[in-house]
């Protein structure tokens, strides 16, 4: 994602955005991910590790279902106090049973933000942790997967960061962002591959 694209999702000057974000092509759970938070009334970038680690879970939790997160203690406090914007310009889902990877973008390839929540780091030297909120698949995603990341409309960004009551109303309605998709090559299946080849259409 370029600094010009990032200006769409924030009020920060381009010089600051260039320092914050670099292009990524294949981000996987447990990796470090930049996100935007609101601190003291200012938008700030923070680096997070993807996946909450509650004491009762052997493995990190990488997403939270919009339909039930307010009923789950693991997510309740982060949702009320620590919401974030996770910038992206696309995401991947894998179609079963052949596990064909598909990339989803907006029709005009504009960047967008996933709805995220975060929690404190497990130790002073660690990064804070976050999860992406998911929702039922839109018509464009449904042929590939039953779920998808919750994509916020640009008009919802400020409310998502500032008001937990309105944020709850936002995720109570399925994401309305229009998407398109195309199959990509198995190159994206390997987490270590984080390069432009991940975006190339299959065939």
Positions of predicted regions on the chain:
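Short linear sequence motif anchored by a di-proline
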Residues: 1-203
């Amino acid at each position: 994602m370029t600094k010009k694209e990032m200006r769409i999702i924030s009020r920060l000057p381009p010089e600051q955005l260039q320092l914050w974000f670099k292009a990524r092509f294949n981000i996987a759970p447990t990796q470090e991910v930049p996100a935007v938070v609101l601190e003291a009334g200012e938008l700030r970038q923070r680096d997070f590790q993807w996946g909450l680690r509650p004491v009762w879970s052997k493995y990190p939790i990488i997403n939270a279902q919009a339909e039930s997160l307010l009923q789950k203690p693991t997510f309740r406090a982060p949702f009320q106090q620590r919401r974030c914007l996770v910038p992206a310009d696309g995401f991947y889902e894998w179609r079963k049973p052949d596990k064909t990877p598909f990339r989803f973008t907006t029709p005009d390839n504009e960047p967008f933000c996933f709805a995220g929540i975060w929690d404190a780091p497990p130790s002073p030297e660690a990064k804070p942790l976050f999860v992406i909120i998911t929702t039922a698949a839109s018509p464009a995603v449904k042929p590939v997967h039953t779920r998808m990341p919750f994509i916020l409309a640009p008009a919802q960004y400020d409310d998502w960061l500032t008001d937990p009551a309105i944020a709850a109303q936002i995720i109570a309605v399925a994401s309305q962002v229009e998407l398109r998709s195309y199959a990509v090559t198995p190159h994206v299946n390997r987490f270590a591959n984080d390069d432009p080849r991940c975006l190339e259409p299959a065939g």
